Amino acid sequence: MMVFLVSFISVEMKSMHCAPLFRQLVFSRSLHYSKTIFHNGRGLTSTSESEMSHFNALASSWWDVNGPQRILHKMNLLRMDFIHDTIRKNLKLNENTDDEVYIPPFSVDLLPQGIKNKIDEDQEMRRDEILNDSSLTVLDVGCGGGILSESMARLSFVSSVKGIDLSADVLEAAKLHKQKDPMLKDKLSYTLNAIEDIPETERFDIVTMFEVLEHVDYPSRVLLEGLKRLESGGWLFLSTINRDFVSWFTTIFMGEHVLRIVPVGTHTLEKYINQSEIKDWLQEDSNRKSEFRVADTKGCVYLPAYGWKFTSCPDVGNYFMAIQRVK
């Protein structure tokens, strides 16, 4: 089954242009609907009753690593890698210091291996120093049962994490699980809030929206509210799903109905958002264009025998995105 799935996806990614009739029948209405919804900034950041009911039903099993949310538990490892790696590689190594590390104006790969290793070692040590002196604040939007929130709160360079969600049942599961680790008591808090309930004057170094935008009614509004709450230089990390055949095949057909590794009804094709649509949305407004930059976008895929892994194609299937507030 796994060989078939990977082979099928590989063929489909190379030959999607060969099925225009299929795409027209399945995706023409979806494309129009999703673009309209994404660009509608007038609605509130709430989600539908059906979405709420679906996630409320999962509350009691949220922390069962072999249960309905096991895919999220596995994805959390990739989330943490993406956040950590993005922050580290974008640190300003020689800011506010007289003891500068050498940053060559060319690729270190051109240097002899010994010199390259020394430069890399010095830079990594400086990154460690900067992070050890950091005290970052985090807002986890759509935190669910707290899988990511707890992981973020355990990072040494994070001082506080606030998780918000619209499901009281799921938040109760998060609060109960938090009590199992006394070290989280003063670093992690949960509140029943939509993001617009958080004062715009309350800013965070990191805002996360993993697997959120495809579950809300007006994703552009949610994304905008998240960006507004970033400190200058802060990061918004998100993950969602491209609206294409591969996504439908892997997440809905295979994931929900064949392999049943995701609860049926978790995903709605029309709510998927192409990564290009988010980038276009950021560029179409002059203020957003000058204030924010997309620093990285990575595709990712779930392989049942392996787990989640990054891919080199963010235009197909699931993807992660890092957006930085530059001023």
UniProtKB/Swiss-Prot annotation:
It catalyses: a 3,4-dihydroxy-5-(all-trans-polyprenyl)benzoate + S-adenosyl-L-methionine = a 4-hydroxy-3-methoxy-5-(all-trans-polyprenyl)benzoate + S-adenosyl-L-homocysteine + H(+); a 3-demethylubiquinone + S-adenosyl-L-methionine = a ubiquinone + S-adenosyl-L-homocysteine; a 3-demethylubiquinol + S-adenosyl-L-methionine = a ubiquinol + S-adenosyl-L-homocysteine + H(+). Its EC number is 2.1.1.64, 2.1.1.-, 2.1.1.114. InterPro entries: SAM-dependent_MTases_sf, UbiG_MeTrfase. Mg(2+) binds at E211, E214, H215. It is a peripheral membrane protein. Pfam families: Methyltransf_23. GO terms for molecular function: 3-demethylubiquinol 3-O-methyltransferase activity; 3-demethylubiquinone 3-O-methyltransferase activity; polyprenyldihydroxybenzoate methyltransferase activity. Its cofactor is Mg(2+). It is found in: Mitochondrion inner membrane. GO terms for biological process: methylation. Component of a multi-subunit COQ enzyme complex, composed of at least COQ3, COQ4, COQ5, COQ6, COQ7 and COQ9. This is Ubiquinone biosynthesis O-methyltransferase, mitochondrial.
